[in-house]
C-alpha cells in the first residue's frame, strides 16, 4: 500500500538585481511530512538497480525545438554527477536569461531536491533569503542572526528554535566538497552531528563560497534565483550529494540492496515522459510536483505527476551547443592504433 498526499508544490525562480540564495534539502521535508523526509525520483519503490526517469518537451510548447539541446545537456549533466567549482560563468547575453541553467535547477526539483536556502517560500524579505533552509520552529517565527562573521548562511549563524532542513557533511560542514561515501554515515540533518564549534548547516551560495572557502564564482545549482547574463550549467558537491544520498535507498546506507542509480533519459518532443517541459500560464519558471510515501520506508517519498514550466514570453537564451563528449573519428582511432603498433615495434626491435 502507498500513502498519497495531494501536496502541490510550485517552486518559482525570482529575478532581481540581487541574488536570492549548502548542504542539500528535499522537497516535502518539513513540519507537516517530517523533518527527515528524503525524496526520490519517480518510479523508486525501495528496490535497487537502475532507475530510469525520462524528460520530454511538450510538443505544444512555444519554444520546443529551441529547448532540445539544453534538455539533452541537462540529462548528461545530471547523469555525470560530476562535482565542479567555478560553475558560475558571466557572459554577455544582451539581458537574456539562460534557459539551460534554469532548466537544470527545475529538473533538480522534479527529482526531489528542494531549495537549499530559505528562498521565496519562506516569505522572508529578499535580504534574508540566503539563510539556510529551515522551518520556523515552535515559535512560528524565523530566528535569524548571522553570527560573529556577519555572513548569512555560514556555520556560526544563530537560528534559535528553527529546525534545520539542510543536510551537511558531518566531517567538516563544507558544502563544496563531496564525501567518498554519501549516506547517513557521512551526512546528517541533525545539528547535534555538526563539527565542534559549528552552530548551523553551512550554506552553499556564492558569497559563502568566496569569503569563507576562497572559491570564486561557485554556487549550488539548487539555490533559488538567477542573474541575467549568467550561466550555471554544472553541478556542485551540494547538488551531487543530494542525488547520491537519495540513491542510498530506504536504509540510507550506501552499498546495500535497496540502492539505485538514477539514469535520466531524454524522451524527445513528447508528453510521454516522467518529467515534461511546458509553457507557463503564470510565473517565470517553476516545477510542479506531488509525492507519494513509499511502503516500508518511513520518511521516504517518491515524486509523481511532475512538470516544469517556463514563461514563453520571457527573454530566454537557448543554448545550441551540445556538452556531449565527441566520439573519436575512425581516422583518429586508426592513427592511435598505428602509434601503439609503432611503440610496440620499437620495444621489441
List PLM regions with ranges.
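General helical secondary-structure elements
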Residues: 15, 171, 340-343
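A short, hydrophobic C-terminal helix/tail in secreted or cell-surface proteins
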Residues: 326-344
Amino acid at each position: 500500500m502507498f500513502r498519497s498526499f495531494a501536496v502541490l508544490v510550485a517552486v518559482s525562480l525570482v529575478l532581481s538585481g540581487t541574488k536570492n540564495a549548502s548542504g542539500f534539502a528535499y522537497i516535502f521535508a518539513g513540519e507537516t511530512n517530517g523533518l527527515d523526509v528524503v525524496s526520490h525520483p519517480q518510479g523508486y519503490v525501495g528496490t535497487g538497480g537502475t532507475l530510469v526517469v525520462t524528460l520530454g518537451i511538450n510538443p505544444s510548447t512555444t519554444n520546443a525545438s529551441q529547448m532540445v539541446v539544453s534538455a539533452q545537456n541537462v540529462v548528461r549533466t545530471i547523469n555525470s554527477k560530476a562535482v565542479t567549482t567555478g560553475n558560475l560563468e558571466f557572459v554577455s547575453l544582451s539581458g537574456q536569461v539562460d534557459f539551460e541553467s534554469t532548466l537544470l535547477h527545475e529538473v533538480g526539483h522534479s527529482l526531489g531536491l528542494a531549495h537549499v536556502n530559505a528562498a521565496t517560500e519562506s516569505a522572508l524579505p529578499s535580504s534574508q533569503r540566503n539563510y539556510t533552509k529551515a522551518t520556523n520552529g515552535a515559535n512560528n517565527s524565523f530566528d535569524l542572526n548571522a553570527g560573529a562573521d556577519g555572513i548569512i548562511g555560514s556555520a556560526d549563524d544563530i537560528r534559535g528554535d528553527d529546525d534545520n532542513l539542510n543536510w551537511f557533511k558531518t566531517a567538516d560542514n563544507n558544502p563544496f566538497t563531496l564525501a567518498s561515501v554519501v549516506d547517513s554515515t557521512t551526512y546528517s540533518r541533525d545539528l547535534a552531528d555538526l563539527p565542534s564549534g559549528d552552530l548551523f548547516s553551512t550554506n552553499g551560495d556564492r558569497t559563502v563560497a568566496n569569503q569563507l572557502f576562497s572559491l570564486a564564482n561557485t554556487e549550488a545549482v539548487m539555490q533559488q534565483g538567477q542573474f541575467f547574463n549568467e550561466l550555471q550549467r554544472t553541478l556542485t558537491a551540494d547538488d551531487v550529494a543530494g542525488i547520491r544520498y537519495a540513491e542510498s535507498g530506504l536504509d540510507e546506507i550506501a552499498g546495500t540492496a535497496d540502492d539505485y542509480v538514477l539514469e535520466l533519459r531524454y524522451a524527445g518532443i513528447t508528453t510521454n515522459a516522467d518529467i515534461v517541459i511546458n509553457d507557463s500560464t503564470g510565473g517565470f519558471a517553476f516545477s510542479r510536483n506531488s509525492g507519494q510515501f513509499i511502503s516500508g520506508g518511513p520518511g521516504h517519498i517518491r515524486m509523481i505527476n511532475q512538470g516544469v514550466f517556463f514563461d514563453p514570453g520571457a527573454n530566454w537564451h537557448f543554448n545550441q551547443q551540445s556538452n556531449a563528449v565527441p566520439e573519436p573519428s575512425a581516422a583518429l582511432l586508426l592513427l592511435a592504433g598505428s602509434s601503439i603498433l609503432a611503440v610496440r615495434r620499437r620495444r621489441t626491435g
